[in-house]
């Protein structure tokens, strides 16, 4: 009876990126991290991060440092859709520009190695309505309302 009353403790799957857990990823240098990334990301990091990318990382670190404990950091807005998500960015809030507005994205460990632009869609998906006049030959017989 006591066993039934005791709730089963939920176990969550520990995140790993290509077999390496998040704590180890945070301790790695860029050179070690590059070995885990796919070819496109390796090439990009080997060519180096530019001044704008470094300033984004600096602003993200500052926002994380100034955030109160157990709170989400302040949103950092950026136009850098081509920035590769690095392990040190995990937990940050980024406003990614889609050409019109800044979409808020919370960076999760599963996003490591992807680009920021992948999480901020630049177009409005099509919601197909009824066909209009001239859409097809059969649409001529649809009565106009």
Swiss-Prot record:
The modification N-acetylalanine is found at residue 2. Gene3D superfamilies: 30s Ribosomal Protein S19, Chain A. GO terms for cellular component: cytosolic ribosome; cytosolic small ribosomal subunit. One of its GO terms (biological process) is ribosomal small subunit export from nucleus. The keyword Ribosomal protein applies. Keywords: Acetylation, Cytoplasm, Isopeptide bond, Ribonucleoprotein, Ribosomal protein, Ubl conjugation. There is a cross-link at residue 108 (Glycyl lysine isopeptide (Lys-Gly) (interchain with G-Cter in SUMO2)). It is found in: Cytoplasm. GO terms for molecular function: MDM2/MDM4 family protein binding; RNA binding; structural constituent of ribosome; ubiquitin ligase inhibitor activity. It comes from the Eukaryota. SUPFAM superfamilies: Ribosomal protein S19. Belongs to the universal ribosomal protein uS19 family. Component of the small ribosomal subunit. Component of the small ribosomal subunit. The ribosome is a large ribonucleoprotein complex responsible for the synthesis of proteins in the cell. This is Small ribosomal subunit protein uS19. It comes from Oryctolagus cuniculus.
């Amino acid at each position: 009876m006591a066993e039934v009353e005791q709730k089963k403790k939920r176990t969550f799957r520990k995140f790993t990126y290509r077999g390496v857990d998040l704590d180890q990823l945070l301790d790695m240098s860029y050179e070690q991290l590059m070995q885990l990334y796919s070819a496109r990301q390796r090439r990009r990091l080997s060519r180096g991060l530019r001044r704008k990318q470094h300033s984004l990382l600096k602003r993200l670190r500052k926002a994380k440092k100034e955030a109160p404990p157990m709170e989400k950091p302040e949103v950092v807005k950026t136009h850098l859709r081509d920035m590769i998500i690095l392990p040190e960015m995990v937990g940050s809030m980024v406003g990614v520009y889609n050409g019109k507005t800044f979409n808020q994205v919370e960076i999760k460990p599963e996003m490591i190695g992807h680009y920021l632009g992948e999480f901020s869609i630049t177009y409005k998906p099509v919601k197909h309505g009824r066909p209009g006049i001239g859409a097809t030959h059969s649409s001529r017989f649809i009565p106009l309302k």
